[in-house]
């Protein structure tokens, strides 16, 4: 992320992403969602999304069968299938989810960005 993009995040979330001591993972579900948005003209990327994620030093977290199964069994607080996969990943992998989407709160996962 560049400085202007980090400034749009909450201060704690931006600081966590900028801190090189942290391992930052991007869900394969997020990459899929971004690719769909690019394909329909909602986002522009000058290079492949995976290459951009890796250039930032982030790791890609694959979606597993366990993630998908867990996502399918989640309560319907949030209906977006991509976000449900990300919630399941955060839960099963015991990761902190960086998000500014308040619809993630009812799932009891650790979040950063909703301060």
Model-assigned labels for residue ranges:
Residues 1-2, 37-38, 74-75, 89:
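A generic structural signal for short
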Residues 34:
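Phosphate/NTP-binding elements of NTP-utilizing enzymes
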Residues 1-26, 39-51, 93, 102-106, ...:
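Short, well-structured N-terminal submotif of metal-dependent ribonuclease cores
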Residues 44-46, 50, 55-103, 114-115:
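Active-site neighborhoods of divalent-metal-dependent phosphate/nucleic-acid chemistry enzymes
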């Amino acid at each position: 992320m560049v400085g202007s993009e980090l400034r749009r995040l909450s201060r704690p979330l931006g600081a966590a992403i900028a801190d090189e001591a942290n391992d930052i993972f991007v869900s394969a579900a997020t990459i899929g969602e971004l690719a769909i948005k690019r394909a329909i003209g909602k986002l522009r990327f000058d290079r492949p999304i995976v290459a951009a994620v890796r250039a930032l030093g982030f790791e890609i977290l694959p979606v597993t069968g366990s993630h998908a199964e867990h996502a399918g069994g989640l309560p319907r607080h949030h209906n977006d299938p991509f976000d449900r996969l990300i919630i399941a990943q955060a839960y099963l992998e015991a990761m902190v989810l960086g998000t500014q989407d308040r619809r993630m709160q009812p799932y009891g996962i650790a979040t950063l960005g909703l301060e």
